[in-house]
């Protein structure tokens, strides 16, 4: 792999960049300089594909472009119809669990999210091919496992499993059985990247450490419900933490490809990616809000999420767009499952520090993250007991 010119950093001197490279993640030596770099097939829009190296992936990131890495699909001879019409799901027309949700929501803790995120961002990077990326996944798995073990759910079939990939960082899936196999999914991605060079420090506090700890806290409080913990919800619930989102939604594509092959009955998928930055909205002179994505999502699920935000959050929503393949919900859509995405703000007001070493905890608003946790908790609880 060729190293991109350090001049691309612009704002950082080369000595600062080299100092930020972890000792166990040194650049490749000269003995490999003549090897041809591995290439990957990416899709930047429906039908718009190209072969690129991994360095070229990060160049696209620097340009603000998003994509699926569909190499595995080609190798397996399976290319799903892009954004097929999802199965018909009748989402509720109104909120039906207000008393239960509001009682549970009072137990959500900003302190828990802060403590988890402080630890999670202490890893040099969570780059999906790095040693630190595997270590961070192991740490996160332990937190999710402890969350489930500390609840009644562990006695009623709840489990936490790794979903292994061909690269070292695994995805994580927590499952809480319901009375049917119809499944409600909430996701976030656990990896991080420095778009200038993968070995450079990438704390990934907002992208997507914030979503990672937001849904972890929602899971903790959800399991305080005896009805959920004891398996009495109508539908099964899953919480996902995906690997390798930054490299082209690799982890989530692997998960939903497997689910499709197994004929899993996934009724909804909500992605929480970047939940912590509110200052961009305030600096623009606008009211604090959460951003409901309206492109490449399921309209019925998205409309119900708007009701959830209105009913359970203390701030309003705004409608915004993020483009093709912009986060892991797109993988669910790709395989025919209804999906939605709620981000921290209008897309243009979201954090500009992502994919750099400056995406750190100090710039995040944990009161804002609490609103995302309320929305996540409310949505999951409502859909867990709905006839979908």
UniProtKB/Swiss-Prot annotation:
Residues carrying a glycan: 96, 119, 149, 164, 181, 232
Is RNA-binding one of the keywords UniProt gives this record?
no
**Which residues of the sequence carry a binding annotation for Zn(2+) 2?**
207, 246, 355
Q: Supply the Gene3D superfamilies for this chain.
A: Zn peptidases
The entry's cellular-component GO terms read: extracellular region
Give the E.C. number(s): 3.4.11.-
Q: Spell out the disulfide connections.
A: 322-326
Q: What is its main location?
A: secreted
Q: How is the cofactor bound?
A: Binds 2 Zn(2+) ions per subunit.
Q: Where does Zn(2+) 1 bind?
A: 189, 207, 273
Task: Give the Pfam families listed for this entry.
Answer: Peptidase_M28
Which Gene Ontology BP terms does the record give? proteolysis
Q: Which CDD domains match?
A: M28_AAP (cd03879)
Localization (cell): Secreted
Which keywords does this Swiss-Prot/TrEMBL entry list? Aminopeptidase, Disulfide bond, Glycoprotein, Hydrolase, Metal-binding, Protease, Secreted, Signal, Zinc, Zymogen
Cofactor dependence is on: Zn(2+)
Any chance you could tell me the propeptide residue ranges? Answer: 20-88
Instruction: Name a GO molecular-function annotation.
Output: metalloexopeptidase activity
Q: Which residues form the signal peptide?
A: 1-19
SUPFAM superfamilies membership? Zn-dependent exopeptidases
Q: Does the keyword section mention Secreted?
A: yes
Q: What family does the Swiss-Prot or TrEMBL record give for this protein?
A: Belongs to the peptidase M28 family. M28E subfamily.
Q: How does it assemble?
A: Monomer.
The UniProt function text for this chain reads:
Extracellular aminopeptidase that allows assimilation of proteinaceous substrates.
Q: What PANTHER family does its record include? A: AMINOPEPTIDASE YDR415C-RELATED, METALLOPEPTIDASE M28 FAMILY MEMBER
Tell me the protein's name. Answer: Leucine aminopeptidase 1
């Amino acid at each position: 792999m060729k190293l991109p010119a350090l001049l691309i950093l612009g704002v950082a001197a080369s000595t600062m960049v080299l100092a930020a490279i972890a000792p166990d993640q040194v650049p490749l030596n000269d003995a490999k300089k003549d090897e041809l770099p591995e290439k990957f097939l990416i899709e930047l829009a429906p039908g718009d594909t190209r072969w690129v190296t991994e360095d070229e992936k990060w160049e696209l990131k620097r340009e603000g472009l998003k994509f699926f890495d569909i190499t595995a699909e080609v190798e397996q001879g399976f290319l799903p119809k892009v954004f097929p019409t999802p199965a018909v799901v009748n989402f509720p027309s109104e909120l039906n669990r207000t008393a239960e949700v509001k009682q549970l929501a009072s137990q959500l803790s900003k302190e828990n999210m802060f403590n988890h995120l402080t630890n999670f961002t202490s890893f040099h990077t969570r780059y999906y091919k790095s040693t630190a990326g595997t270590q961070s996944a192991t740490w996160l798995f332990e937190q999710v496992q402890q969350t489930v073990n500390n609840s009644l759910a562990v006695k009623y079939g709840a489990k936490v499993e790794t979903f292994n990939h061909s690269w070292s960082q695994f995805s994580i899936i927590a499952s809480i059985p319901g009375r049917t196999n119809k499944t409600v999914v909430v996701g976030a991605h656990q990896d991080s990247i420095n778009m200038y060079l993968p070995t450079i420090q990438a704390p990934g506090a907002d992208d997507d450490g914030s979503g990672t700890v937001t849904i972890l806290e929602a899971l903790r409080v959800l399991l305080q419900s005896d009805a959920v913990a004891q398996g009495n919800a109508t539908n099964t619930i899953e919480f996902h933490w995906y690997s390798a989102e930054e490299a082209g939604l690799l982890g989530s594509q692997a998960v939903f490809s497997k689910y499709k092959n197994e004929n899993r009955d996934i009724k909804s998928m909500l992605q929480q990616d970047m939940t912590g930055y509110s200052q961009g909205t305030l600096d623009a002179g606008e009211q604090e809000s959460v951003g409901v994505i309206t492109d490449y999502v399921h309209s019925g699920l998205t409309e119900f999420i708007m009701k959830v935000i209105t009913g359970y959050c203390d701030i309003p929503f705004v409608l915004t767009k993020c483009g093709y393949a912009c986060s892991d919900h797109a993988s669910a859509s790709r395989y025919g499952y209804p999906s939605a995405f709620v981000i921290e703000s209008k897309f243009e007001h979201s954090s500009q520090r992502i994919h750099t070493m400056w995406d750190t905890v100090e710039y995040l608003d944990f009161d804002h993250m609490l609103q995302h946790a309320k929305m996540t908790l409310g949505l999951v609880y409502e859909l867990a007991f709905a006839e979908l």
